[in-house]
Amino acid sequence: MAVEKVNSSSSLAEVIDRILDKGIVVDAWVRVSLVGIELLAIEARVVVASVETYLKYAEAVGLTATAAAPAV
């Protein structure tokens, strides 16, 4: 995947359209500990994409019901 560099400014609508078209994943992992005792652990994965984009990539990795169901 190539990175495109554009010198002109983009409107908010163009940025949102691009994010929904390509999708974005934010993966976070936080651990809070005090004196070696873990007090809090948070693990999160946030996916922002259009339904069409999500289904295209989810089916490719077997996350949809049609991809997981055995063929009869």
Curated annotation (Swiss-Prot):
Ranges annotated as spanning the membrane: none
Species of provenance: Synechococcus sp. (strain JA-2-3B'a(2-13))
Pfam families referenced in this protein's UniProt entry, alphabetically: Gas_vesicle
Known partners and oligomeric status: The gas vesicle shell is 2 nm thick and consists of a single layer of this protein. It forms helical ribs nearly perpendicular to the long axis of the vesicle.
Family the entry assigns: Belongs to the gas vesicle GvpA family.
Compartment(s): Gas vesicle shell
GO cellular-component term (any): gas vesicle shell
Keywords: Gas vesicle
Principal place of residence: other
This protein's name: Gas vesicle protein A
Role played: Gas vesicles are hollow, gas filled proteinaceous nanostructures found in some microorganisms. During planktonic growth they allow positioning of the organism at a favorable depth for light or nutrient acquisition. GvpA forms the protein shell.
GO molecular function, one term: structural molecule activity
